[in-house]
């Protein structure tokens, strides 16, 4: 039985990637194989996949979800849109010296006013005055992760999105997908590797460390996903032919496994609080492409459940010793599902 301290590790600060490499696919890839570890280039992913294998990408698009504003009382606030609820309302985190109250107006980006609604846990409901996505795109700022020390610029607005991002709604990028450029996608397709897409809107909770030593006490954050019947058909066809289902990132993994709780993948949309820890039985995914994750994070627990705790522990020690780049703008791993006990 694992506890929180089992997922802690010391990471030299200089290994936290602050900027992306000049070329998306120029990053490194640590291949954690059954018989050891192999240092590769990310472009080698072509050699690790066979014709008929199915890559499942998360096509969410990161919103410019961060705003700075002023309450009608004059106090400064910072707003992070967590989720778009409908055409007029969002859930958002608000940082202010004094908590806003329902009915209060907040001027955002010196451009438009939102009205504060009821508070639900750590989020406030905010009413926007018009097209939410248009206002966010025009006036918001890209919300880079807290460990990236520079303010988002125009370069980040391109590079903190996947090249196939389509469905706006995330406040963090599905970072394993950042390594794929169009040339690499074309090479994979020419080899006969198949593509499918899910949408899971990554929330700010993805960066939150677990705080309970007893993992069973952790309150997992909620994220919304949708999986089409077309994707379900592609997964079932690949499985029937004996091919691998390769999740591009933990967010694709979370969507696929959340929709497979009946035993096989089902189409639909839902909120998921699925918390994957060692001992979980994977139902759909057989391979995983993922970046290196934060200490004590739910994502580190997920990859440990998938590839094996000891294998991941050794892989992270190897990555640190070999100076891999960590976190969102960092390098990647290619993992094989651990055989069931």
Swiss-Prot record:
UniProt protein name: S-adenosylmethionine:tRNA ribosyltransferase-isomerase
Family: Belongs to the QueA family.
Catalytic activity: 7-aminomethyl-7-carbaguanosine(34) in tRNA + S-adenosyl-L-methionine = epoxyqueuosine(34) in tRNA + adenine + L-methionine + 2 H(+)
Annotated keywords: Cytoplasm, Queuosine biosynthesis, S-adenosyl-L-methionine, Transferase
Keyword DNA-binding tagged: no
Localisation per UniProt entry: Cytoplasm
Subunit text: Monomer.
EC number, as in UniProt: 2.4.99.17
Record-linked NCBIfam families: PRK00147.1, queA
One Gene Ontology term from the biological process aspect of the record: tRNA wobble guanine modification
PANTHER family: S-ADENOSYLMETHIONINE:TRNA RIBOSYLTRANSFERASE-ISOMERASE (PTHR30307:SF0)
UniProt organism field: Herminiimonas arsenicoxydans
Stored Pfam families: Queuosine_synth
GO terms under cellular component: cytoplasm
